[in-house]
Amino acid sequence: MRTISVLASVLFFAAIMNAQADSVYVRTGADGKDWTIGNAIAEREVRFDPRRGLYTASWRHLVTGTDLMNVAGAHRRGGSEFSFLADADSLAGSNGSAWEFVAAETQRLAPSGKLLTIKLRARAKPIDVTAFYAVYEAHPVVRKWIAITNRGQTLITLSHLSFETVNLAPGPPNVLQVSAFYGSQPREIFFTGRVDDTAVLERNSLTGEGLMVMNEAPGYMKRTELSGWGEGVQVMYDTDLFPFERSLQPGETFTSARSSIAFCVDGRGTADPRWVVPSYTSQVLMKKGTAYQPPWIYNTWEPFERGITRSITMDLIAAAGRMGLDVFTIDDGWQADYGDNAINRKLFENGLDEIQAAVETKGMRLGLWVPLAAISPNTAVYREHPEWLCKDIHGRPKFTGTMAGSQAVMCLATPYREVAAKRISDLIGRYHLKYVKVDLTTVFNAYGESPGCYAQGHDHRSWAESLGRIYEGIQYVTDRIYRDHPEVLLDLTFELWGQKHVIDYGLLGAGDLDWLSNVDDGRRGSAGPRQARTLLYLRSLAIPSETMLIGNLQADMPPIEERLATAMGSGPLFLGDLRKLTPAEQDWFGEKIRWFKTLRKEVPVQEGFFPLGNWSQPGAATWDGFARLSRQGEGMMALFKNESRLDQVEVKLATFPDGTYRVRSVMTGKTLGSFTGEQFRQGIQFRFPAEYKVELLEIRK
């Protein structure tokens, strides 16, 4: 058995090395209607047949040799490929009589990918559909979406749109297991995924082979169906609670959200999902990709809230600079009114120019909070364009509760989106902003206010259409801002996206970051860093951890080392009154933050995220932690003792790469020894430093 295991490992790592060496490909069959798109890890064959239409003939995981289109039984059909309603007419890709093949082409795609486009023309309806299939080097993933064009002379209304429909499974139904909620929570195999199910993991409980289904539709618009009792996958928009509807004018094209399906195998080296998914999402789905280096961000919201002043800010800037932070953000309170860039001169009597100068003198960049669609009735745009207001089901203007009182909600499916984009873009240019926290109610909020817009005369023809159109409006605003300021970091908060603690691929397609939560951390006994880590761990398989800004950990709350180590697992973010930190504590932060920045520049730790200990529900009586590692095995670990009485814990990582590694305690500065990848796979005991409840470990070759 040992010989077989070693041979399997050799063959597996050879496949991975070939995958990294070989380019991706699209191969076209002799008749021009058969295409194979893939790399050395995964390969999908798509065909067009006049009788069967467009369909997936095979989809192989080349690491194992499994064709996941056949594994559940030869009696199954391939699936519809895509489907939607156009007015009352149902159209599915696999209905051969409904389509005429028009053309196919291949093009290069960043990063290191190929794109296959297949264009079809409906026979009975003036509609063209283009199906897009993308594959990227070294990722066992095929990404898919469609575009629908109205070739007719009258408006067409789309609904019930599935952009990926395929009978794909890693095994027969009686051996399948499903994990939803970012791939972390067990569910039944006949399952409907919604807002918190941007990624759903389906695996074979006998072989460990599985697939991760990633739906890039935004917020509540997403729906993922694991059909029947293990009878295939549909990646789609919602049809009932947040129903998708989209009108297409003559000549107009609608491009759907994207689907990504990744293949993985538990415990099989870098084919394990904890390597596959973080590598793919951080390199392909993150807006800034592999070039991204996460800044250390400070934000004034807690404890100062709207009481932040010039004097307090200047003191905080000095402390933040000494700590080695990169972005100093003034949250709500700097502006005179929501929806206007005028400064609140009662709090910042000299404006923000001197604040910007002070921040940049300390080697940082300024960040600001802005509301997107919630604006003050005092603003010019509110007075001059009441027709752009969102309206409720009774036709009344919508208002939303904020820390500044009730504010009007503007509909982003109107020309207001252009006004909002210009306002934020002007603000970025005026103050050389590195980061913008874009906040508050859009489609709806996270606190029970009703969604959507019922107004007449907007770009939506119905309430249902307003839902998707408002998300499109957010994308329009961010696209316009990035066009003017490509290097800025846009944070689209959970309140803007409309759900507590939500983050998804639709959000990451529109922005860089997500202020995920406001964890209370203001006093002894508050929820604090353990709850922040709970949010992190449950999302860390599906979501690039550095896109999550988990407020509101306060840097001055003891134990400060727990706040620091927790921040290293996500997008590093601090709040708090930095003036309460002693100079020695500020210097301590600075030393550790400089260490982390150096590590992050030298080691791509975004390639793998591994929760440790009692991670699925961290508790006071048990330990938890995480490892962030490159595919070469270098990186860092954070171990949290909590209130357990443990002096040491065993760290075991079943897919740790081969090699010899030097491990150093960042907390004490001492080298703990050299360890092999095999030792990490079997388990290593690490002691907590006597003076800390936290251990930070650096792992280098």
Where in the sequence are the language-model features?
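Glycan-recognition surfaces
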Residues: 378, 382-415, 468-580
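Aromatic-lined carbohydrate-binding/catalytic grooves of carbohydrate-active enzymes
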Residues: 291-425, 431, 435, 445-447, ...
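Short Pro-Gly-centered flexible turn/kink motifs
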Residues: 41, 246-265, 691-700
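Polysaccharide-binding surfaces and accessory modules of carbohydrate-active proteins
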Residues: 21-38, 42, 55-233, 242, ...
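C-terminal beta-strand-rich structural cap/linker in extracellular carbohydrate-active enzymes
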Residues: 673-701
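Carbohydrate-binding surface patches
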Residues: 616-658, 692, 696-698
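Conserved, mostly hydrophobic/aromatic
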Residues: 41, 146, 251, 298, ...
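Aromatic- and carboxylate-lined catalytic core of secreted/periplasmic carbohydrate-active enzymes
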Residues: 570-571, 575-614
